[in-house]
Design a protein with these regions (language model features):
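Sec-dependent bacterial lipoprotein signal peptides
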Residues: 1-13
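Short, high-confidence coil segments that cap the C-terminus of an alpha-helix
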Residues: 69, 91-92, 195
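Conserved phosphate/oxyanion-binding catalytic-loop motifs
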Residues: 103
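Short active-site segment of divalent metal-dependent hydrolases/proteases
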Residues: 96
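Exported/periplasmic ABC-transporter solute-binding proteins
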Residues: 13-65, 80, 84-87, 99-100, ...
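A short, gly/pro- and small-residue-rich
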Residues: 109-116
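Conserved beta-strand core positions
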Residues: 44, 70-72, 125
Length: 257
């Protein structure tokens, strides 16, 4: 749930109106409660930035437990790839990107044209090191001299945009870099020891530690937190199930736990 994000330095900014969506697919019998049952059932598909994978799983379970008949599915990928999939014809009910840049791109596409977006949470980039710190990387400046493998997201992915900006700001050229498509791939590389260091989010660091992987970390104080805007697609805007899920996401204490 969203409080798990806050615990890892994601903060709910909660304002405005963001909505989710889905195709309502439940059939009800002719009982007195059938109308209410139909209104609260259906499917909701959310395209979400890869760094939200742990929170999304918790949200799915919590909402479905409280709303039998509703099927919420989060699809995780790098934000840029999600926008590309939508451009190629995918029609999720809702999109949550890890930056405003990719959301702006999505809103230029027909499926999200005219959609309003709302920032749900923020996240923070951090430099992490593999267990035992084999690359002896204790500061950002150590990246200037290390021969260790450093994992970085592709530049068009939010985590990559932030990482490359930080490297450029400090005049750092990596000697031995590996480029990954999404932040969870970077986290996996470092967690498994296939990279000595990498740029991930504080949420990914928290998730690794929860799994018992003791990654080291180097704070990046001059990196601004990035925002996670959410928007409904045209498909989602017509879904009662999606709108109800969205309202729960914004207002429910359970969602914020």
């Amino acid at each position: 749930a969203l409080s798990a994000l806050a615990a890892a330095t994601l903060a709910l900014t909660g304002c405005g109106s963001s909505q989710t969506s889905s195709s309502s697919a439940a059939s009800a019998s002719g009982s007195s409660s059938s109308a209410a049952s139909q209104a609260s059932s259906g499917k909701v598909q959310v395209f979400a930035a890869a760094s939200l994978n742990n929170a999304g799983a918790d949200l799915e379970k919590a909402y479905e437990a409280a709303n039998p008949g509703v099927d919420v599915t989060f699809v995780y990928e790098g934000s840029a790839k999600l926008v590309t999939q939508i451009d190629q014809g995918a029609t999720p009910d809702m999109l949550i990107t890890a930056d405003t840049k990719n959301m702006d791109k999505a809103k230029k596409l027909d499926e999200f044209s005219g959609s309003d977006s709302t920032v749900l949470v923020t996240n923070k980039l951090v430099l992490v090191t593999a267990e035992g710190n084999p690359g002896k990387i204790n500061s950002l400046d150590d990246l200037k001299t290390t021969d260790g493998v450093v994992a970085v997201c592709k530049e068009d992915v939010p985590c990559g945009t932030l990482a490359h900006e930080e490297l450029k700001k400090h005049d750092i050229t990596l000697k031995n870099a590996t480029t990954e498509g999404k932040v969870t791939d970077v986290a996996t590389k470092v967690s498994t020891g296939n990279a000595d260091a990498g740029f991930i989010y504080t949420t990914d660091l928290a998730a690794a530690k929860k799994k018992g992987v003791n990654l080291g970390s180097v704070d990046l104080p001059d990196v601004e937190p990035n925002e996670y805007p959410a928007a409904l697609s045209k498909t989602g805007a017509s879904s009662d199930a999606a709108k109800k899920f969205n309202e729960w996401l914004k207002t429910s204490d359970e969602a914020k736990k």
